[in-house]
From Swiss-Prot:
Modified residues (N6-acetyllysine): K144
One example of a Gene Ontology biological process annotation: tyrosyl-tRNA aminoacylation
Family: Belongs to the class-I aminoacyl-tRNA synthetase family. TyrS type 1 subfamily.
Motif ('KMSKS' region): 235-239
Origin organism lineage: Bacteria, Pseudomonadati, Pseudomonadota, Gammaproteobacteria, Enterobacterales
Transmembrane segments: none
PANTHER family named among the record's database cross-references: TYROSINE--TRNA LIGASE, MITOCHONDRIAL, TYROSYL-TRNA SYNTHETASE
Name listed for the protein in its UniProt record: Tyrosine--tRNA ligase
């Protein structure tokens, strides 16, 4: 991605919501590499899909020769960002936040190159400059540059101030000052001249731009990526089970892959622009091919492959594809014990059972059937498989060989209704 027209290329992909002084930023980028940053607050023990677009944006800038700084908010994570939040956040303990900082730093690391010469990425933590700052320094050196009149008029907090049932604490109100100072600090430490973030961060970013100008007399810039929405109006990045996480222990690679496979046709080509590094030409060619093929579109599989590989690596992608294929074909011989552990985590409904159970009871306990009577009829009609093999004996008791790896048995009723038995 050539640096001189990087902003234009990001706009073509739909990745720019707002940008400050676009002309001056384009000129600055044309002059040569810059340092830029994006902040990630440890509000949980993992990043989720909402973080992926700004994180990949950092990567796009690095590929164009710029120096990315990934800032994990060890200090701001202790306070909580009120931007567009309906209620006050719960404050987490310092120990919890520190634990989450470590996890998030490890999650961010594979996306960036920390050893590539002059534009090697930097990992930073704002606790390094806030941890030992006393309240008088904070109020005198930072607070005096902020106008409360302007702060209460920022869209991000205005909604909270106007709600009778929910005000805003001084703690959360001061968040804007902390993030603003991050920008000024990174500008001084690493020459950072651009902050990127989600569109909900616009107010915090512009505060940082103003503060950097006041403290260091430097012109810096802000760019926000859009909030990702789906064509049907439902929230992106959520499933029935909640958020889609980047940590494989919270959302398995199989579940992650399936999330992308289930992308609507109305969204898939847009998402290829947001979440992959395919060129616009490649994406347009794929869309044209799908339109004219007369078959199911290929785009969802391309998207699922690309994003799963980015987040979980080749091994995670191959496991996700292997599980998908085995469930589709009914043949489980290729599945490893780790694959079954993914299914048990979140891939299919799971039930724990004591050894010695019979098939009818398993169908009831797994909620594949409402009663033993109904289970008997279903088994007799040849509609039940155990580990891919049909079983038509209603009086069947599980045998040792049904327990794959001594732990797992996969039941299927009909073509698509699965349940995994985990034996106690």
């Amino acid at each position: 991605m050539a640096s001189s027209n990087l902003i234009k290329q990001l706009q073509e992909r739909g990745l720019v919501a707002q940008v400050t002084d676009e002309e001056a930023l384009a000129e600055r980028l044309a002059q040569g590499p810059i340092a830029l940053y994006c902040g990630f607050d440890p509000t949980a023990d993992s990043l989720h899909l909402g973080h992926l677009v700004p994180l990949l944006c950092l990567k796009r800038f690095q590929q164009a020769g710029h120096k990315p700084v990934a800032l994990v908010g060890g200090a701001t994570g202790l306070i909580g960002d009120p931007s567009f939040k309906a209620a006050e956040r719960k404050l987490n303990t310092e120990e919890t936040v520190q634990e989450w900082v470590d996890k998030i730093r490890k999650q961010v690391a594979p996306f960036l190159d920390f050893d590539c010469g002059e534009n090697s990425a930097i990992a930073a933590n704002n606790y390094d400059w806030f941890g030992n700052m006393n309240v008088l320094t904070f109020l005198r050196d930072i607070g005096k540059h902020f106008s409360v009149n302007q702060m209460i008029n920022k869209e991000a907090v205005k909604q909270r101030l106007n709600r009778e049932d929910q005000g805003i604490s001084f703690t959360e109100f001061s968040y804007n000052l902390l993030q603003g100072y991050d920008f000024a600090c990174l500008n001084k430490l690493y020459g950072v001249s651009l902050q990127i973030g989600g569109s909900d961060q616009w107010g915090n970013i512009t505060s940082g731009i103003d503060l950097t100008r006041r403290l260091h007399q430097n012109q810096v810039f802000g760019l926000t990526v859009p909030l990702i929405t789906k064509a049907d109006g439902t929230k992106f990045g959520k499933t029935e089970g909640g958020a889609v996480w980047l940590d494989p222990k919270k959302t398995s690679p199989y579940k992650f892959y399936q999330f992308w496979i289930n992308t609507a046709d109305a969204d898939v080509y847009r998402f290829l622009k947001f979440f992959t590094f395919m060129s616009i030409e490649e994406i347009n060619a794929l869309e044209e091919e799908d339109k004219n093929s007369g078959k199911a579109p290929r785009a969802q599989y391309v998207l699922a492959e690309q994003v799963t590989r980015l987040v979980h690596g080749e091994e995670g992608l191959q496991a996700a594809k292997r599980i998908t294929e085995c469930l589709f074909s009914g043949s489980l011989s290729a599945l490893s014990e780790a694959d079954f552990e993914q299914l048990a985590q979140d891939g299919v409904p799971m039930v724990e059972m004591e050894k010695g159970a019979d098939l009818m009871q398993a169908l009831v306990d797994s909620e594949l059937q409402p009663s033993r009577g109904q289970a008997r009829k279903t088994i007799a009609s040849n509609a039940v498989t155990i580990n891919g093999e049909k079983q038509s004996d209603p009086e069947y008791f599980f045998k040792e060989e049904d327990r794959l790896f001594g732990r797992f048995t996969l039941l299927r009723r009909g073509k698509k209704n699965y349940c995994l038995i985990c034996w106690k």
